[in-house]
Each structure stands twice: as structure tokens, then as C-alpha cells.
Regions:
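Juxtacatalytic helix/coil linker segments
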Residues: 2-31
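Catalytic NTP-binding/metal-coordinating core of nucleotidyl cyclase/transferase enzymes
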Residues: 19, 27-82
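Catalytic "initiation/cleavage/transfer" segments centered on a nucleophilic residue
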Residues: 21, 122-236, 241-242
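Long, highly charged amphipathic alpha-helices
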Residues: 54-65, 102, 106-114, 165
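Catalytic core of nucleotidyl cyclases, primarily class III adenylyl/guanylyl cyclases
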Residues: 74-98, 127-147
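Long, charge-dense
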Residues: 90-132
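Conserved small/polar residues in nucleotide/adenosyl-binding loops
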Residues: 243-252
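Hydrophobic alpha-helical segments, chiefly the membrane-spanning helices
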Residues: 254-260
């Protein structure tokens, strides 16, 4: 019988590592994640103001990928940020075991990769730049507080949206000390631009939720299956499909204000 030698040095080093790297989210509680673009105020210089639809499409595609491939239940994006929520009822294993460092590093790396992969098609003038995302994660005590977290981010999105629309047309001196409502009114008075006429995506961001559909195979799908696939012998076999779907509000198209 081979005796495995003790490794006190390795054991001690692993203990140090796991004191921090081993931290996990409390089971059963909603886990919130927020990713932010690093120095995007510099990265986005030269893009269309106040809103660039191409950048929005890249952010939407990145959020959709995180929801579909990384187990989040809901994803929300506005400006240069993405918010996700994870919630696993019962004994279901949370994404990456709920380990904070592993989860944040994987999500930041995934968002960075997916975002940069989209640049050549949507923003070719930025394709040579490297966009980066940071990530943080935390738990909240209830689903109600998870919903409030998203409400907070959407309210922030609307406030930022008004500011961006106003700053695209008005000077810093014009806007100094004005409330969000006052900025909105001045934009309309000076330029005839009604902020409410912007598309919902520009005013409130975009939502994606995870949808699982269990159904039988279609005839076309059965024809394409390998000869020995179990579904050929069992017509009642079900398939579980995963979709990411935008909220109904985000499917509503509205035109940009003509003078924007």
C-alpha cells in the first residue's frame, strides 16, 4: 500500500486561499450580480448621441448570453451595466456552487468575451479596442428585495437617460443644478424633444428572462435524430428547451424623436 506523504505547506497555503476564495452565497437566498463596463465613458467616445442603437444591441446580446448560458433567471441591462439574479429553490445547486470569487471572475470574463466578439459586426470602428467588465455579487434576504434591486436600477436608467438626452443638446451651464424633471422640460422648450417619445430601450433599458419549455419532438426533429436515439422508440419522450425572451414591453417598437 502506497503511503501518500503529508504536505503541510500545501495544506496551509490552500487553507489561506479558501478563507477568501471559498466564500459562498447563503443557500436559498436570491443572489444578485452586477457587471459594469470599465471606463466606458472613454470607450464610447465618438458614438452616436444620446443613444447608439449599435451599442445597445451589443449590450443586449451580452446580457442574453449570460442569462442563457450562465444560469441566471433574469437579466437587465442599461447604459454600460448588466444586472442578473440567481435563485434556486429547494436543493438545486446554485451556479458554480454560489462561490463568489469563481462566479464573479467567470461572469466578468464571459461578458468581456461576448461583448468584444460582437464589436466587429456592430461597432467596427471600436473593434481594435478591448472592452472590459468588472463584476460584483451579493445576496439579499428575499425575492421582494431582489425585485427592488432591479427597480432601483431601472429608475437609475430613466434618470441617466434624461441626462444623456439633455446633455446631447444643452450645455453644462444650461443644465447646472436642474432636476431630472427640469432637464426634461428644458429639452422640450429649447429643442422640441419630448423624452417620452424615445423607445423604451433608451428610457428604461432591456430585460431578458429565462424560459424553459418541455415538449415532444416534432416530426422534422425526429427525422434528424440519430437512428438509435431513444425518441425513435419512445414517442412520449420530452425535450427541454431553453430560451431567453425579452419582456413584452421591450418587444414594442417606437421611433426615435425626429429631432433627436
Amino acid at each position: 500500500m502506497t503511503t501518500i506523504p503529508d504536505d503541510p505547506l500545501g495544506d496551509r497555503m490552500k487553507e489561506y486561499e479558501m478563507m477568501e476564495a471559498g466564500r459562498r452565497a447563503l443557500p436559498g437566498l436570491p443572489l444578485l450580480v452586477r457587471l459594469d463596463g470599465k471606463a466606458f465613458h472613454t470607450f464610447t467616445k465618438g458614438l452616436e448621441r444620446p443613444f447608439d442603437a449599435r451599442l445597445q444591441r451589443v449590450m443586449d446580446a451580452t446580457t442574453r448570453h449570460l442569462v442563457k448560458e450562465c444560469g441566471a433567471r433574469i437579466g437587465y441591462t442599461q447604459s454600460d451595466e448588466i444586472s442578473l439574479v440567481y435563485h434556486h429553490e429547494g436543493k438545486a445547486e446554485p451556479f458554480l456552487g454560489g462561490r463568489f470569487q469563481k462566479l464573479t471572475s467567470i461572469l466578468a470574463a464571459t461578458a468581456t468575451f461576448v461583448f468584444n466578439r460582437q464589436l466587429a459586426a456592430e461597432l467596427p470602428e471600436k473593434a481594435e479596442r478591448m472592452a472590459l467588465f468588472d463584476c460584483r455579487a451579493w445576496v439579499v434576504p428575499s425575492l421582494e428585495e431582489a425585485a427592488n434591486t432591479f427597480l432601483w436600477r431601472e429608475l437609475d436608467a430613466s434618470k441617466n437617460s434624461v441626462a444623456m438626452a439633455a446633455q446631447a443638446r444643452l450645455s453644462h451651464a444650461d443644465l447646472q443644478g436642474l432636476s431630472t424633471k427640469q432637464q426634461q422640460e428644458l429639452l422640450f422648450q429649447r429643442h422640441g424633444i419630448n423624452w417620452n417619445d424615445y423607445p423604451a430601450r433608451c428610457k428604461r433599458g432591456a430585460w431578458f428572462h429565462r424560459v424553459e419549455v418541455v415538449r415532444g419532438f416534432t416530426t422534422d426533429e425526429l427525422d434528424k435524430l440519430p437512428p438509435l436515439h431513444a425518441a425513435r422508440k419512445d414517442p412520449d419522450l420530452r425535450v427541454c428547451l431553453l430560451y431567453t425572451s425579452p419582456s413584452p414591453r421591450d418587444r414594442t417598437r417606437s421611433r426615435m424623436p425626429s429631432s433627436a
